[in-house]
């Protein structure tokens, strides 16, 4: 597995545990790419859902993917401040086609005041039965929910006060 290079434009593909495509982001600019970490940015990019419907993102976003954690984080820049959407997912993989991960349903939405809500627990329970997630997946995801909430409280990693703004400034250099 390689990793995307700085300045490269890539697609992001989200899959379900059973291998079916969940969602695709058409274009994300890579701001940092290493074996263990990818930071990207996009703005008004086309998103295609598994049923073929498409929509366009409304605001600039900074995307954080790590090879050692079972989550990814999207920081969305809005007028009221930065909102974060955190997907509990497999660590990322990258090939010539796209940056890829498996979406495990659970999400955490973080508000500008750093309060947060765990979302889609019902969807997780349903899909864990239908797709037969092994018990180890449940253990890993619970551990990563705890890790993620700790990062939120500590303002660590993508939740650090200047993280999103700093990477957005870098993204602007590629847009002009």
Curated annotation (Swiss-Prot):
GO molecular function: magnesium ion binding; nucleoside diphosphate phosphatase activity; ribonucleoside triphosphate phosphatase activity
Reactions the enzyme catalyzes: a ribonucleoside 5'-triphosphate + H2O = a ribonucleoside 5'-diphosphate + phosphate + H(+); a ribonucleoside 5'-diphosphate + H2O = a ribonucleoside 5'-phosphate + phosphate + H(+)
UniProt binding sites for Mg(2+) 1: 87, 103, 107
SUPFAM superfamilies named in the record: FomD-like
Family from the record: Belongs to the Ntdp family.
Biological role stated in the UniProt entry: Has nucleoside phosphatase activity towards nucleoside triphosphates and nucleoside diphosphates.
Protein name: Nucleoside triphosphate/diphosphate phosphatase
Organism: Bacillus thuringiensis (strain Al Hakam)
């Amino acid at each position: 597995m390689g990793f995307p290079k700085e300045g490269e434009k890539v697609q992001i593909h989200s899959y379900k545990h059973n291998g079916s495509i969940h969602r695709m982001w058409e274009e994300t600019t890579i701001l940092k790419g290493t074996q263990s970490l990818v930071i990207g940015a996009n703005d008004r990019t086309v998103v295609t859902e598994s049923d073929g419907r498409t929509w366009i993102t409304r605001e600039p976003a900074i995307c954080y993917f790590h090879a050692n954690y079972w989550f990814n984080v999207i920081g969305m820049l809005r007028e009221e401040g930065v909102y974060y959407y955190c997907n509990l997912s497999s660590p990322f993989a990258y090939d010539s086609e796209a940056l890829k991960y498996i979406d495990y349903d659970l999400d955490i939405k973080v508000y500008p005041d750093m309060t947060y809500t765990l979302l889609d627990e019902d969807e997780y329970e349903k899909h864990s039965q239908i797709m037969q997630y092994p018990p180890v997946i449940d253990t890993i995801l619970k551990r990563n929910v705890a890790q993620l909430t700790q990062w939120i409280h500590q303002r660590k990693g993508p939740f650090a006060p200047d993280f999103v703004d700093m990477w957005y400034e870098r993204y602007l250099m590629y847009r002009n």
